[in-house]
Structures are given as structure tokens and as C-alpha cells.
Design a protein with these regions (language model features):
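Small-molecule-sensing regulatory modules
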Residues: 11-59, 64, 84-113, 121-306
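Short, structured active-site "lid" loops
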Residues: 59-80
């Protein structure tokens, strides 16, 4: 009881008895990553007492891993694939396969920036002014290489947190910190001197896993669905009814992926129109559609877009 017969046919890939080991970033990206997987079709359920969330897919096993360490574990083969930032791939110099870019973060669907920050009244105006200075950052390896490539000698020390405060309190001359908008930095009386790195989330995989045809196929399927979920966040669907004699005027307003779908209604003088548009365009587009003669306008969110 409870076991499949020897010749049972299953719908899962041949490697189902050895599931893919997927790393979910623990910490600031955790909630956003689980939400992205949910939109893509996978329900991941974390547990308070361990680091191994449940997932409703027998071909995958999950582990919560710090984003800073993810690339190292994927490179070793401890994990087959995982999600982490480009910044931590570069920091660890891990040899991994980058499957796809997924531009999302804890608070938005845009990249983050590692920036050089100094107190507002600091004499440092450019990166070259860092010669002989003391810099605090969590991204030590990358920062040292960045400066070395430009022939700048400076002391770079690891920061365990509250990095911005070190610059405010005068403990260091500058910090290299991550930000999405820069608002917190400015609120602390600090000034951004330069952007050092634009970073976003990457789905990475172990080279051995990618060399296996079945595992590679499954990894690429996961990537496809995650990208489809992210793409859908930027778009909405619009449906409306349009008088036949005003169709051309309405269609001219639509920045569609392709030509909009137009179908006939029972009343031959009216047509139904459906299209996909940028979510940010709707606030201006709907009033324009109304003015052009469209009626019964409906807007609805998309879950995936391939």
C-alpha cells in the first residue's frame, strides 16, 4: 500500500525520484520570491522550525538559503538551482550557469543599485577621491576589485549591518550600500557619489544539472513560468464594446502587443475588442477610449504572459 506498481506510468519527468534541489533566498527576498512562485503556479509553504519549505511539486525540493551564500552552494552542487542577486554572484565569483534574469526585489519590480555613499559635506566628489580612505560595505570582494581595476588604493572593511550609520557617525569615510530609490540614504543626510553596480535577481543553476537533458528541461520550464509571471505584472487586459463605425478610431489608441482581438456581437452594429496594454497606460487610455466611443470597458489583471 502507498507505493506505485513497478510499471506505473507517471506524468513527471524521469528524474522525479531525484527531485531538483531549489534554493529560495532567505531574508528580504523570501516573501517576494514565494509570491512569484505562487503566481507562476507553485505553492511554497515555509515552516517556522526548519529551513525546508514544502512545495506542491514532487519534482522539486526547497531549501531556504541566504542570498549571499546561494551561488556558492549552487556551484558546489549542494543545490541544483536557486535565486540570488547578480551582486552576490559577482561577490562570491561562483562558477554557475545564469538561466535567466528576474527583475524583482522586496519592494518593487525594478533593479537595485550598489552605490558609493558619503556624508553630505564630505570632500569626496568622485570615485577617484577614495584613495587612502576607509570604506565599509557588505560587498567587500566586489568593492575591492572595483577599486583595484581603477588603480585606487583604499581600505575596504566588512560591515555586519547598519552600514549607513557608520558614515553618519564618522567611523568610515564612505560606504558602499544597496538601494532601490535612494530615499533612505538622503533621509540620513548622506549623498550618493556614484553607482557601482546595477543588480537584479537571477535564476542560477549548477553546470552539472544543466548538462543533464531532463534536468535542464525542467529548469528551463521553471524559468519560463517565472518570467511569464513577472511579465504579466507589467500588463493588464482590456475588453470593451465598440460601435462598428468607430472601430478604427478606438484601435488607433491601443498600443497592443499585436493587433487587438475583434469579434462580432449579436448586434451587427457593435464589435467586442480585447487587447493587452501596459498597466501604467490604463489611467490615460480608458478616458481616451470612452471619448472615442468605447463602452462597457473592463480591465483585469493577468497571471502569466508568455
Amino acid at each position: 500500500m502507498g507505493h506505485n506498481p513497478p510499471h506505473c506510468k507517471c506524468n513527471y519527468p524521469a528524474f522525479a525520484m531525484t527531485p531538483l534541489k531549489l534554493g529560495i533566498p532567505k531574508g528580504s527576498l523570501e516573501e517576494a520570491t514565494i509570491a512569484l512562485f505562487a503566481q507562476a503556479g507553485w505553492r511554497i509553504t515555509p515552516h517556522a522550525r526548519n529551513y525546508y519549505p514544502d512545495i506542491d511539486d514532487p519534482t522539486i525540493r526547497c531549501a531556504l538559503v541566504r542570498a549571499q551564500e546561494m551561488a556558492r552552494y549552487v556551484a558546489r552542487g549542494t543545490l541544483d538551482l536557486g535565486l540570488t542577486g547578480l551582486d552576490w554572484i559577482l561577490e562570491t565569483e561562483a562558477d554557475v550557469a545564469e538561466v535567466c534574469t528576474l527583475t524583482y526585489s522586496k519592494a518593487s519590480n525594478r533593479p537595485s543599485r550598489w552605490v558609493l555613499v558619503v556624508p553630505e559635506h564630505s570632500p569626496i566628489e568622485r570615485v577617484e577621491d577614495l584613495a587612502g580612505c576607509k570604506i565599509a560595505t557588505e560587498l567587500v570582494g566586489f568593492t575591492r576589485r572595483y577599486l583595484a581595476e581603477r588603480g585606487i588604493e583604499a581600505e575596504v572593511e566588512f560591515s555586519w549591518g547598519a552600514t549607513e550609520a557608520k558614515a553618519v557617525e564618522g567611523l568610515v569615510d564612505a560606504v558602499v550600500e544597496i538601494t532601490e530609490t535612494g530615499s533612505t540614504i538622503r533621509a540620513h543626510g548622506l549623498r550618493i557619489v556614484a553607482d557601482l553596480l546595477i543588480t537584479d535577481t537571477r535564476l542560477i543553476a549548477n553546470h552539472t544539472a544543466m548538462a543533464d537533458p531532463a534536468r535542464r528541461t525542467r529548469i528551463e520550464q521553471i524559468a519560463l513560468m517565472l518570467k511569464a509571471a513577472l511579465a504579466a505584472r507589467q500588463k493588464v487586459a482590456l475588453k470593451c464594446n465598440v460601435p462598428a463605425d468607430k472601430l478604427d478610431a478606438v484601435v488607433a489608441l491601443l498600443p497592443s502587443l499585436h493587433a487587438p482581438t475583434v469579434s462580432h456581437l449579436y448586434d451587427k452594429h457593435w464589435l467586442a475588442l480585447e487587447t493587452i496594454v501596459d498597466a501604467t497606460a490604463v489611467r490615460d487610455l480608458i478616458p481616451s477610449l470612452c471619448a472615442a466611443g468605447a463602452e462597457g470597458i473592463l480591465e483585469y489583471e493577468l497571471r502569466k504572459m508568455v
